Design a protein with these regions (language model features):
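Active-site Tyr-X1-5-Lys
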Residues: 107-135
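Substrate-positioning beta->alpha
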Residues: 118, 150-151, 168-189, 195
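NAD(P)H-binding glycine-rich loop region in Rossmannoid oxidoreductase-like domains
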Residues: 5-10, 16-62, 70
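A conserved pocket-lining segment of Rossmann-fold NAD(P)-dependent short-chain dehydrogenase/reductase
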Residues: 105-107, 157-175, 179
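Mid/C-terminal beta-alpha module of Rossmann-like enzyme folds, strongest
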Residues: 183-246, 263, 268, 276-294
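Flexible, glycine-rich beta-alpha linker
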Residues: 87-89, 111, 132-154
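Conserved Rossmann-fold NAD(P)-dependent oxidoreductase catalytic core, especially the SDR/UDP-sugar
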Residues: 65-111
Length: 294
């Protein structure tokens, strides 16, 4: 299902049937789901700035309500909801977040995270109350080729474009995009209805990530760590300046956070094997270079 205004460069070579419509249109969703045995819901607004909560709610929550209703109306066999790791509480490197952790990131005041959490809870409620054949996958920060927009690949491009590289004090879990795709397939084949599965690769601080990027790319850079209090102060100023600021309190909070997870449950139950993050970075670098992003 593709909205009429979508940029489809990233999928032109995929042999698939497409349906033109919008996920926030109940009529479009009902028509798109008709005749499907399995539905994968991966669409959402992921931008962390310049978006009102009403827009997040419409695309991330209300659309999920429409899609689950359509799945039940058309008696689909399986529904895979692609959520985010941040609906699950993160942890440290020594004790990373797992599927038993509750939601703890409400303090981040992120419209994206909050709307995804509400949508995930709605899916799980429909599983319990109305027998929706739903399974949730929770990918971490995805890296790899074919990032047309780019989305998460902006972090790599940022690391390539600066001789003096300022980086935040926190860290996160990085996962190869192909491992996430494989995780979705395995969830269809092996996942248990009503369960959540973190799709989580390797935990790295931002300093470790950029040093790895520096080594793989061969770039010569001076790296400077930004103190947390400086970043958070700048984030507060950005929030006061309005929704257009790329750095607001929510993004600053997340950049300072130890945002670490484990994918052991998906390794055990979905039989996933995670690719080293070096391969994900190398694949992204090669693709960006071939397509003239740098």
């Amino acid at each position: 299902m593709i909205r009429p205004s979508a940029d489809v460069k990233g999928i032109v070579n995929i042999p698939c049937e497409t349906f033109s419509g919008s996920i926030d249109s109940n009529t479009d969703v009902m028509q798109a789901v008709a005749g499907c045995d399995i539905v994968i819901h991966a669409a959402c607004i992921t931008e962390q700035w310049g978006v009102s909560f009403a827009a997040y709610e419409r695309a991330n929550f209300t659309a999920t309500q429409y899609i689950t209703a359509a799945c039940m109306a058309h008696h689909v066999e399986k529904f895979i909801y692609v959520s985010t790791a941040n609906t699950i509480g993160p942890g440290s490197k020594n004790n990373p977040g797992n599927e038993l952790n509750g939601f703890t990131l409400f303090n981040a005041n992120s419209g994206y995270i909050n709307s995804k959490y509400l949508a995930q809870q709605y899916v799980l409620e429909q599983v319990a109350a109305r027998k929706l054949p739903g399974i949730v996958v929770n990918p971490t920060f995805m890296i790899g080729p074919n990032d047309v927009k780019p989305s998460s690949g902006q972090l790599i491009l940022y690391g390539l474009q600066h001789r003096l590289l300022f980086y935040p004090p926190g860290g996160k879990n990085f996962v190869h995009i192909r491992d996430v795709c494989q995780g979705i397939i395995r969830a269809i084949e092996r996942g248990r209805t009503g369960d959540c599965y973190l799709l989580a690769g390797q935990n790295l601080s931002y300093g470790e990530f950029f040093r790895l990027l520096k080594r793989i790319s061969g770039k010569r850079q001076l790296m400077v760590k930004i103190p947390a209090f400086v970043l958070k102060a700048a984030g507060i100023i950005g929030s006061l300046a309005g929704t257009g600021s790329k750095l607001n309190y929510s993004t600053a909070y997340m950049l300072c956070l130890d945002n670490y997870y484990t994918g052991k449950k998906s390794e055990r139950e979905l039989q996933l094997r995670y690719t080293p993050v070096e391969a994900a970075i190398s694949g992204a670098l090669d693709w960006f270079k071939e397509n003239n992003y740098f």
